[in-house]
Amino acid sequence: PGLFRIAKLYIGEIENRYLTGEVRRKVIYHLYKLPQVTINNEKVLLHDGETFEIDGIKIECFLVPGHTWGHMVYLIDDKYLFTGDTLWFGADGGYSFISSLAESNKLAVKSLAALEQKLQSRDLHPLFLTGHTGWTDNFEFAFAHKDKLCSPFKKRVPDPTAPYDAYDESDDTEKMAKSGFLKGVGR
């Protein structure tokens, strides 16, 4: 079961095909198929460009295929862009997400460039919140390497401000986070 067993699931119509079994997720350059995930929650299927509200919060959906065939990012109140696995932030800027995990690297790079254009055409400069590598409010930093993939096999520029992750995490508390211990990247 779990904490969210009765929660309504908002998911892109294309992404939902992974949950129905119509499509199987392939990783490590398509050498390995992930097991099917089944979720029995009530679902609301979303489409590219769709805007809806939940409790007065505006949510806009942008289809950015590549990492998965139906990967979406969500713009909240024109201020916050939840990018999931679309962007990977290195110390020197944003890249298209990890190449070995993409359904199509070429499509991922193309989608990232299209996302940048959509935001620029509307003069939007949201806070970018990634699924794995933090956040930034620096638009140029977020798209610095939009035409490049984050490769798990190439040396990346180290981030001297990134916390070392092999330590006792007892100090990783809400108080420490609010005190400024955790900073956005590219600022």
Language model feature labels by segment:
Residues L34-T38, F128-H132, K175-F181:
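A general structural signal for short secondary-structure boundary/capping elements
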Residues I14, E50, I57, K79-Y80:
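Well-ordered beta-strand scaffold positions
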Residues F4-I6, I54-G56, D123:
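Short, well-ordered coil/turn elements that cap or connect secondary structure elements
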Residues T161-R187:
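C-terminal regulatory/interaction regions
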Residues K58-P65, W69-F153, D159-P160:
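Metallo-beta-lactamase
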Residues L46-G49, G56-I57, L63:
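Intrinsically disordered, low-complexity Ser/Thr/Pro-rich tracts
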Residues P1-T51, D147-K148, P152-Y167:
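Active-site HxH/HxHxD metal-binding segment of metal-dependent hydrolases
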